[in-house]
From Swiss-Prot:
Protein known as: Large ribosomal subunit protein uL24
Quaternary structure (record): Part of the 50S ribosomal subunit.
Encoding gene (name): rplX
PANTHER family linked to this entry: MITOCHONDRIAL RIBOSOMAL PROTEIN L24
Skewed-composition ranges (Polar residues): 69-80
Family membership noted in the UniProt record: Belongs to the universal ribosomal protein uL24 family.
CDD domains referenced in this protein's UniProt entry, alphabetically: KOW_RPL26 (cd06089)
Region (Disordered): 48-111
Domain of life: Bacteria
NCBIfam families, A to Z: rplX_bact
Organism annotation: Salinibacter ruber (strain DSM 13855 / M31)
Basic and acidic residues biased stretches: 48-65, 86-95
Its biological purpose: One of two assembly initiator proteins, it binds directly to the 5'-end of the 23S rRNA, where it nucleates assembly of the 50S subunit. One of the proteins that surrounds the polypeptide exit tunnel on the outside of the subunit.
Length: 111
């Protein structure tokens, strides 16, 4: 289950040494594939042929998706944390709902 969304700033927790510990914003989430695109991480070079819309063609750099297990969100202290889920009762309606929370600080991540 993917517990990340586009509003979270995250840190890359594993992988190549040049990218481990990098902090960036989650640009896109692919829940079916359990992958996310993080800004500035896993940048790949794509070669494009010249076409009518792109006269020159050439090389373009784009971020490629990485697995969600390699990404951790950043809590309010600026440290990498894990995400948990707990049921909280809504005081207005009396109904319970699931919320995501940071394991290190215990603060809720959902608005």
């Amino acid at each position: 289950m993917v517990m990340l969304n586009k509003t979270i700033t995250s840190a890359k927790s594993a992988g190549e040494d040049r990218e481990a510990g990098y902090v960036g914003k989650v640009l896109k989430v692919f829940p079916d594939e359990q992958r996310v695109i993080v800004e500035g991480v896993n940048v790949r070079v794509f070669h494009e042929k010249p076409s009518r819309s792109n006269r020159e063609g050439g090389r373009t750099e784009r971020e490629a998706p990485i697995h969600v297990s390699n990404v951790n969100p950043i809590d309010s202290n600026g440290e990498s944390t894990r995400i948990g889920r707990k049921k909280v009762e809504d005081p207005d309606t009396g109904r319970s709902r699931w919320v995501r929370y940071a394991k290190t600080t215990g603060e809720e991540l959902d608005d």
